[in-house]
Amino acid sequence: MTEWSAPSVYLCIATFRRPDGLRKLLTHVERLTYRGTVEVIVVDNDGDDRAGAAIVEQIAPTFRLPLRCDVEPRSGHTYAYNHAFQHACRATPAPEYVAVLDDDEYPDPNWLTEMIRVAQVYNADIVGGPVFPVFDDPDHWLAKSGFYAPSRSATGPVSTIYGAGNMVIWRSVLAQYLDEPFHHAFAFTGGSDYDFFWRCRNDGRSFAWADDARVFETMPPSRTTVGYVLRRKFRNGTEATRLERKFLCSLAGAARRWCIGLGLLGLGIASLPLAVLRGRRAIVASLMRAARGAGRIAAEFDLHYEQYR
């Protein structure tokens, strides 16, 4: 980053009963090539076992970067991340940026350098990047299916980003939402990041995408099942409807939501007979479409899948 400054960054990590994942993540964080000041806070969301806190206690004395751990006993990832955000925004000296990674991820060494470069070049308030799946069994047919392909965009300004698992935000922007940046209504269902981005967009915040700022997500066998894929699609459907009901609350918006939900469900079911002839990938693709539609319809009746409880 010879042409740009290297502003200070506070890296926020929430963890819940993934000590091995947290250890791997912190190992890769220590390998970051970013030349600016980086401080790391881990918030353990398990008030009982505190396995994440134990990992930080082991690692911190020899860790290359300033590293601390707090425990957030209130259940739900929104509480953990909001705890981390509040600490980052009130830190002294104040960091210029706040970054976010999840405890089942690990970054490329150049990740933070690229995120900050894009933030500065495009003067963006919030920057996102791709998250690539890494499978325990890369030869599993689901791993090869394309169903797990990451969201991508060209590097540069975008209307929004796709999730907080790979994110950098101006601290001064985050501080304006500090009462509850991630709303606790989404604590167990997911979607709090999309809700936050929608609010930011409505407030005129700018977004950019850093397609070379790569993060990798570990995918154990429990995530390479048809059931997992369908539950995830159902949850995606409920998230979409919840947010549209909140931010696009009109008769036209309601009609659009129902058309999309019923259309996806109907198309998914109608395509099954042909999919049976084409093989298991086609069958699962049809079921995924139907699951997303079912999730959209379920959310109209305030029914949600609590993936994180």
Located regions from the model:
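Acidic donor-binding loop at a coil-to-helix junction in glycosyltransferase catalytic cores
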Residues: 187-198
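Non-catalytic, C-terminal membrane-associated alpha-helical segments of glycosyltransferases
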Residues: 231-235, 249-309
